[in-house]
């Protein structure tokens, strides 16, 4: 599994979690049973880190929204932002530029065009604030 595929799996798990209060293990188990996408240990580790740090991640997101609240962000864009910000702030092995680039690719794949610009803008603001 490539790093991009691992990131995409973590994004899909993060998106799924936005619809339930299930635990990380329950969400991963159901996703593996459905076999809609590949999930490896690295993807689960990334997803678990996102879930464990979600409040901090969401605080960072909210801080960088202009005239928005986090509740207005689409669930897809929010999942992309959570993955990227987790990697930017909590993973030393991933550079911010790579996290942002990968987030934009995920946004291009899964969101509307306007959301791609929104995601990129929020992440650029987070990156500048370090």
Which stretches of residues belong to each language-model region?
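N-terminal interaction/assembly modules
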Residues: 1-130
């Amino acid at each position: 599994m490539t790093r991009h595929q691992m990131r995409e799996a973590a994004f899909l798990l993060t998106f799924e979690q936005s619809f339930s209060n299930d635990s990380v293990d329950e969400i991963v188990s159901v996703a593996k049973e459905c076999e809609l996408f590949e999930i490896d240990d690295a993807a689960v580790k990334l997803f678990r880190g996102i879930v464990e740090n979600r409040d901090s991640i969401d605080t960072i997101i909210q801080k960088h929204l202009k005239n928005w609240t986090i509740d207005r962000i689409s669930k897809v864009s929010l999942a992309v932002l959570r993955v990227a910000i987790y990697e930017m702030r909590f993973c030393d092995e991933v550079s911010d530029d790579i996290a942002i680039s990968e987030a934009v690719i995920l946004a291009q794949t899964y969101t509307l065009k306007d959301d791609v610009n929104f995601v990129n803008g929020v992440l650029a603001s987070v990156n500048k604030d370090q």
